[in-house]
Amino acid sequence: MTARRLIISPNWIGDAVMAQPLVQLLHKEDPHSPIDVLAPTWVAPVWRAMREIDTVIETPLKHGKLQLGHRWKFARQLRQRGYRAAYVLPNTLKFALIPWLAGITHRIGYKGESRYGLINRMHHDDRAAPRPMVSFYAALAHAPAHHFAHPDQLPKPRLHLDEERRKKALDETGVQFGKPLIAFAPGAEFGSAKRWPTTHFAQLAHIVRDAYPEADIVLLGSAKDHDVCEEIAAQVGPKVKNMAGVTTLEQALAVLASSDAVVSNDSGLLHIASALNRPVIGLYGPTDPDHAPPFSDVAKTISLRLSCSPCKKRICPLKHQNCMRQMEAQMVWDSLRGMLAS
């Protein structure tokens, strides 16, 4: 029996997508050795959309909590599955405990919180010049080295939904087949600084509706984004459907996979849409578009690159959020129009 390999998932949806090239590299290296993932429940649907993954083991572990009893429970479960290697993607000591407790021989990851002993094939990152996320994770497929592959040298992150699953999930949402579909993702888990203003999303929706009156516009996000999306829907009217907090992540995957174009802040949904290879426009303000750009074949990154950005702050420290506010709806439409026309 071929020994299995295990990936310990990050807590963030976008980070899980950025780790997909690592999965492709591991599968190419040994296609007969199954790859499993230990993932939080809210991230698990992303891993299930990766063809190279064999089994996704869901955990109730909460972000920032030690929950030592739960970690020991999962370690015992993993010990029985016979893993030869574990790739620990989060940088915290807590996640490195699990494969160590499970007795997995090779434990690969970054130094993180001084995880000496818990990680025994240790990689190091330059915090002064952090790598692009896909390069950061993909480096774990090889022996530790000072150099790393540029994103252009790596496989692109890719997710796949089979047609039956996609149609079933779409039926559950009430989204109609055969009509032009544009998805907006106005939320941002990281913080309010990353959000394009609701007024701007509403202006863009009006422009889209005037140009394509037959199109459906859907607003996607988590329950935390519902009120933000409701503000947009209230400004636009019934042609916009607020699905934030209503859909499961798997249903959101199906909607994104069926969209003719996606406009999103720098969020997990942007990276899902990109990995599904949909035409996407990513709106970047306080974050660096070169650190985690979209990788779909048709993609546009919009960033004003003001002198104060990327500040990487959750809330604008200058109180004006000009990096997002000065990004006008017409500017976004100029890119979106070409995507919809083609």
For each feature predicted by the language model, list its residue ranges.
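Catalytic machinery of carbohydrate-active enzymes
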Residues: M1-S342
